[in-house]
């Protein structure tokens, strides 16, 4: 189970890096948007740390980075922010 979670974090981190680079932003900009230090952000991209759903919503809100893409790698769907927020117990306004 621990290995599976680590592999998921690595895959999400790779997609996070790709999305950031494709958007033309620096690690510093994404770290600031997530309210974490640059070193912490680097660990998110490398998969050492897992990206929390609440942080995914912040990236969506600021940069339109699709949380479903980060989780699954699927780019071909309609993302529903309200449903995602509801699923993690947050209210989206």
Regions found by a protein language model. Name each.
Residues 1-2, 61, 71-93:
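Short, charged recognition helix plus adjacent turn
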Residues 1-22:
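A short, Lys/Arg-rich alpha-helix, primarily the initiator
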Residues 12, 23, 37, 52:
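Flexible coil/turn residues that form the inter-helical turn or adjacent wing/linker of helix-turn-helix
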Residues 16, 27, 53-56:
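Helix-turn-helix DNA-binding elements, focusing on the entry/boundary residues of the two helices
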Residues 19, 33, 44, 73:
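Residues in the recognition helix of alpha-helical DNA-binding motifs
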Residues 24-43, 58, 62:
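Short alpha-helical DNA-recognition segment
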Residues 54-69:
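DNA major-groove recognition helix of helix-turn-helix/homeodomain DNA-binding modules
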């Amino acid at each position: 189970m621990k290995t599976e979670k680590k592999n998921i974090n690595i895959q999400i981190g790779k997609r996070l890096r790709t999305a950031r680079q494709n958007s033309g932003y620096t690690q510093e900009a994404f770290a600031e948007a997530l309210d974490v230090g640059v070193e912490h952000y680097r660990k998110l991209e490398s998969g050492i740390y897992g990206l929390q759903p609440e942080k995914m919503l912040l990236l969506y809100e600021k940069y339109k980075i699709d949380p479903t893409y980060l989780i699954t790698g699927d780019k071909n769907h309609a993302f529903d922010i309200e449903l995602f927020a509801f699923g993690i117990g947050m209210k989206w306004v």
